[in-house]
């Protein structure tokens, strides 16, 4: 029983605790998503790459960081990228009481909407951790819970080539299975504000170069 609960709470593909948006049966589509920003050290470089390649992505932002980087948040939105809620403090919401879950999500949504002047309708739980209350509160606040199906530990892999190759293997496997790829990379860090995200940013550039001619890059809100 304990193992089943842990699977439901942490495995991104699990739907046991409630439906989440992962990726549809559209093998020609890829969604680049970035967590734990905004990060003034690395997000601007990422935005330059995306603009040059004419690719739109999805950014799941930590509210407490967004509050101090309002111009960067606006820059992300004005470039046509999706802004999503990644909680206020990046805590494990599966272990939090309902009152705190509501506060973390509500405060982040209100802050982001005030900054960009547009609705925020997607939410990615920190660590992918959730329980029924997390998903229920998110939906009550008008947020679609979004998980993923392509991730590697980019935050601890020092090589952009290794990150890109590991993700490419997953992407190709998903295409063979007839699925789109919902890819997670990190332009920030919840634990180390000064963490080097150069490998993750470079890996995103490599993935775009590899798949731009054969796949379509979309924002996750294209899927629901």
Language-model-detected regions and their locations in the chain:
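Hydrophobic alpha-helical topogenic segments used for membrane insertion/localization
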Residues: 1-10
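A cross-domain feature marking catalytic cores of carbohydrate-active enzymes
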Residues: 34, 61-63, 85-87, 125-127, ...
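Charged helix-capping and loop-helix junction motifs
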Residues: 74, 101-105, 160-167, 197-204
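A short acidic, helix-capping loop that chelates divalent metal ions and anchors anionic groups
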Residues: 91-96, 156, 191-194
């Amino acid at each position: 029983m304990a193992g089943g609960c842990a699977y439901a709470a942490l495995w991104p593909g699990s739907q046991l605790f409630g439906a989440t948006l992962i990726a549809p049966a559209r093998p020609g589509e890829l969604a680049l998503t970035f967590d734990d920003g905004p990060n003034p050290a690395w997000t601007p470089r990422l935005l330059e790459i995306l603009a040059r390649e004419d690719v739109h992505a999805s950014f799941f932002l930590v509210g407490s960081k967004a509050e101090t980087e309002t111009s960067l948040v606006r820059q992300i939105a004005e470039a046509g990228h999706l802004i999503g809620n990644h909680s206020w403090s990046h805590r494990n919401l599966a272990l939090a009481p309902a009152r705190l879950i509501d506060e973390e999500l509500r405060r982040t949504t209100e802050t982001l909407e005030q900054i960009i002047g547009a609705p925020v309708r997607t939410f990615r739980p920190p660590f992918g951790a959730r329980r029924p209350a997390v998903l229920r509160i998110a939906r009550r606040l008008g947020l679609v819970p979004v998980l993923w199906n392509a991730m590697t530990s980019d935050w601890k892999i020092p090589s952009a080539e290794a990150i890109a190759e590991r993700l490419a293997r997953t992407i190709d496997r998903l295409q063979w299975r007839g699925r789109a790829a919902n890819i997670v990379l990190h332009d920030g860090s919840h634990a180390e504000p000064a963490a080097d995200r150069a490998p993750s940013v470079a890996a995103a550039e490599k993935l775009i170069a590899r798949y731009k001619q054969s796949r379509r890059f979309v924002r996750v809100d294209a899927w629901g």
